[in-house]
Amino acid sequence: MATFKDACYHYKKLNKLNSLVLKLGANDEWRPAPVTKYKGWCLDCCQYTNLTYCRGCALYHVCQWCSQYNRCFLDEEPHLLRMRTFKDVITKEDIEGLLTMYEILFPINEKLVNKFINSVKQRKCRTEYLLEWYNHLLMPITLQALTIKLEDSTYYIFGYYDCMEHENQTPFQFINLLEKYDKLLLDDRNFNRMLHLPTILQQEYALRYFSKSRFLSKGKKRLNRNDFSDNLVEDRHSPTSLIQVVRNCISTHPNDYEWNKACTFVVDARNYINIMNSSYTEHYSVSQRCKLFTKYKFGIISKLVKPNYIFSSHESCALNVHNCRWCQINSHYKVWEDFRLKKIYNNVMDFIRALVKSNGNVGQCSSQESVYKCIPDIFLICKMEKWNEAVEVLFNYLEPVDINGTEYVLLDYEVNWEVRGLVMQSMDGKVPRILNINDTKKILSTIIFDWFDVRYMRETPMTTSTTNQLRTLNKRNELIDEYDLELSDVE
């Protein structure tokens, strides 16, 4: 029983404006849709159901029925989902605009209530006020919203969401924004609406209103790699392939600074209809490059590391070792399809082996060493505290020598030409024979930053940018990277 969906279905018959604004895929004929993956609330129709991915942002936030309209909360076109989406910072004036929009689209008055009651009573056995027949009249106006933080912006998608107690497998979390408004004013609005309902329906309306307006907000969730779909990637077998997104736009291109004003468009019905008549779609191909995806990839590598290689005498690089039970790595994982990760893994292991061999550690593949525990963490460059600790453990294991208050280790073992070049790049064109802890960190970070410079990466993929941001980046030709040409960050 999705109250918001039912309200849209019945209220869209009132007038021309409502028929345009309240048209939901969930109320239309079902069309073939992508398979669902997560349980949660569809942002478009607010029902709790199985969700599929959005073609505008790659997040799972739309049901199979609503997916046919390709609406995203980051769109530019002021459809109902976009008008219910607000960005920080929300003012009392912004909330007034939202409440006014609700009053325009979902009015409750004596004439309208009688019209709905008469419509229900036309059918036999419907003289009672059963809740399922009048569900559309039982949607209170609340400041209940689902929230998500993307980069530096926090988005709030207002609506009436049933079944709040159910399991939520999406990164969106419930928040109560009643504190941004006057509690008594909101109560008064709803009591005035409730007065026009029969007594039995008044009781249910009041119960729903207080349950959805007095709840405690939940803590915000952190995004992870699995929150984004791979279905929008051009070539899922290519790690550098672009993500295809579609955004709904309008010809006037409103500024992002006026994001929270979208809900005011419905005040002037004629102007709103003209705006919607100018709508069109824009298609963008964006890079997968971001910290979230990078952290996920390095997390996999840290679990596949074969630290025994740093004591070995294999002539081949770390990933090309065969017929050695201690050093041979499983190269069938999808992560190794990325040539950048291959280079990083080989070069990091080559450099660490050079340090170990240079400082008198005579071991072999099969030896069990305490230093092995820290090697996987050296690939977790996105977790700097953990990474620094791992490098320090490695450095101390090499038994550094104190020279004038600074500890040094040797570097006189042969490294491959690529590592040599990266050492020279980070050490002002020289290959030093001794290294302190800062030099060691600098070289190891340079090897990784050569392809994944996380210092200058976005936290989330560009699919979470607003339409205006995508348009601006596209004009600067900054939506894609040059990894397909095997050009590194440095190059």
From Swiss-Prot:
Please provide, in alphabetical order, the Gene Ontology terms of the cellular component aspect for this entry. Answer: host cell cytoplasm; host cytoskeleton
Q: Does the keyword RNA-binding apply?
A: yes
Q: Which Pfam families match?
A: Rota_NS53 (PF00981)
Q: Where is this region: Interaction with host IRF3?
A: 320-491
Short motif (pLxIS motif): ranges: 485-488
Q: Where is this region: RNA-binding?
A: 1-81
The protein's UniProt keywords, in alphabetical order, are: Host cytoplasm, Host cytoskeleton, Host-virus interaction, Inhibition of host innate immune response by virus, Inhibition of host IRF3 by virus, Inhibition of host IRF7 by virus, Inhibition of host RLR pathway by virus, Interferon antiviral system evasion, Metal-binding, RNA-binding, Viral immunoevasion
The record, for InterPro entries, names:
Rotavirus_NSP1
Q: Where in the cell is it found?
A: Host cytoplasm, Host cytoskeleton
Region Important for cytoskeleton localization, residue ranges:
82-176
Which GO BP terms apply? symbiont-mediated suppression of host cytoplasmic pattern recognition receptor signaling pathway via inhibition of IRF3 activity; symbiont-mediated suppression of host cytoplasmic pattern recognition receptor signaling pathway via inhibition of IRF7 activity
Molecular function terms, GO-annotated: metal ion binding; RNA binding
Domain of life here?
A: Viruses
Where are the disulfide bridges? none
- Region (Zinc-binding domain) residue ranges read 42-79
- The protein's role, per its UniProt record: Plays a role in the inhibition of host innate immunity by inducing the degradation of key host factors required to activate interferon production such as IRF3, IRF5 or IRF7. Associates with components of cullin RING ligases (CRLs) including CUL1 or CUL3, which are essential multisubunit ubiquitination complexes, to modulate their activities.
Self-association state and partner proteins as the record states: Interacts (via C-terminus) with host IRF3; this interaction leads to IRF3 degradation. Interacts with host IRF7; this interaction leads to IRF7 degradation. Interacts with host CUL1 and CUL3.
| Family listed | Belongs to the rotavirus NSP1 family.
Q: What is known of its domains?
A: The integrity of the zinc-binding domain in NSP1 is important for degradation of host IRF3. The pLxIS motif targets host IRF3 for degradation; however phosphorylation of NSP1 pLxIS motif is not required for its activity.
Q: What is this protein called?
A: Non-structural protein 1
Q: Which organism is it from?
A: Rotavirus A (strain RVA/Cow/United Kingdom/UK/1975/G6P7[5])
Q: What are the top taxonomic ranks of the organism?
A: Viruses, Riboviria, Orthornavirae, Duplornaviricota, Resentoviricetes
